[in-house]
Amino acid sequence: MLSIDEQQRVLILSTLWKIAMNQPEDPEFPSLGIFKCMVSLLHKSTNDKSWVLDGQNIYIPYYAAHIVGSYTMNSLDFAEKAVESGVIPPLLDLLRGKISWVEQRVAVRALGHLASYDSTFETLAVHEEEVVKLTMGLASRCSELVYNEFVSVKDTNLRVNYHKNLITRGFGGLEMENRKAEEWASQIQCWSLHLLNCFAVRGRSIDLICNQDFLKDLSSMWGGLVNHTSPSGIGLIRILCYTQSGRRKVSESKEVIECICNLSRSSDAWQYMGIDCLLLLLHDMDTRYKVLEVASFYLLDLIELRKLGERSKVGQKITKALLIDFKNGKSRIKIPEIDRILKQIWVTKVDKKRRERSMSDEKLEEKRVMVNLIKQQANNSFWLGDIETAVEKYTEGLKLCPLKLRKERIVLYSNRAQCYLLVNDPDSAVSDTTRALSISKPANSHAKSLWRRSQAYYMKGMAKESLMDCLMFINAFVTVDKRKQEKIPYYAVQMIRKLMDSTWFFASAKSKLSNESNSSSNGNSSNEEFTKDEMSGLYTILEEPMIRKHKEAVKRKLNKYGKQKDSFMALSI
């Protein structure tokens, strides 16, 4: 292969690359010694700079490493042959960054596949400390690396030519290049985390991975919309929480715990992983009291969650974890607020449930009528602009409403959340909408609550959580009755447009580069995620109220709360 013309060599490799991608389990080329051939090409690429920079040879290391990764993806036999052929040393050279981030991407992919099998993992584990450190660094800085070296270069003619050709396969302009670069950067991060998972799941390098700075980075790693099938950072955090030393390190990081708690109250597909992490930490008596103060505040809203995906009795498991030592006199809780929350959980899940078991159908129907009357009173107060009275009435209705009347309670919680939004109390709005979504069947399916929680999260500056709820709202909105062919609401489109910019994979890297540039020019920088104009521009989305006759009265009354004349009435009560 090394003796033929470089253009022919690249043509042959690109053909082998396609075959390996489309037929990764075909034994023909692995049996003919393709791995030894790839090893010789990789060694030449990493050790002979003048050779790799000669003409088309620059494409060789990418194709060679990609071919190794494709053939070892699903086959233990091929993985063992690759290791015996000596693929690990040259792949490590690529992982070290000897060439560029493009080659690091395919190197970490191939090493991740080799680490997936027990027999080949041991050979890689000889370099354990270096591999783990390199991979942690790559996972943390890949967004900055790709942004600074590729995406931030606005003139496509100034970008590295072979990077552009590999990323877009020769098609598309600046927009396509940026979109594919985001996808590749996200893959680098996800594949790096997969490689770290292979060590962590075997109980290896836990203390090394649990570096506090890396844990903070890990908690913010999100596969995003381009890699929605990857659990990303939370997947590795959950694996760490299955080990005693991992739980101890995780519990010591306030930022990580808050991130896990936020995930547990979101409509993210990985919500259950956040809940799992908190339950593991609460069941360990060495970490329980380090996280209970924060976790109880969030988990209180999830105690009635019945089913989440394939997981059943989720709320019951949460309740048991929170009340482990509440009534046996062994609790070490000294903080009044935590004690209040646990008492509230006990009253809701134990006392009230026990009392309602013997409630007759006639009594239940009587309660339903009374609750509906109170709800109507609250609605009238709301439309008259008396938000404080409306909150009091919704609260009264919730206290009276039996747990069995789930639909009524969903409406009461969601309507009270709307009131909290109007008085600028997003924390209470998130709490109430989460409770409504926990009661809904299936979980996280009540459209109005999704929209209201999306707004509340936006007000708190939590773009990712807001985006997830907004997307779920649109999904619920358009699937309610497909025959009606409802159009997606404009206000939801406006919300998503803003949130997509804030949750862009390179948003942090762009902000950091911009701040460094501003700092060097005038010494001023800003870390605010949202500007005041953005906040007010989105918060004041005007929606058409359902009850028009009170529209002007509502506008007049809402001015008391500092709202503009056209304050929105989001998904009206």
Language-model region placement:
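Alpha-helical tetratricopeptide repeat
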Residues: M1-I573
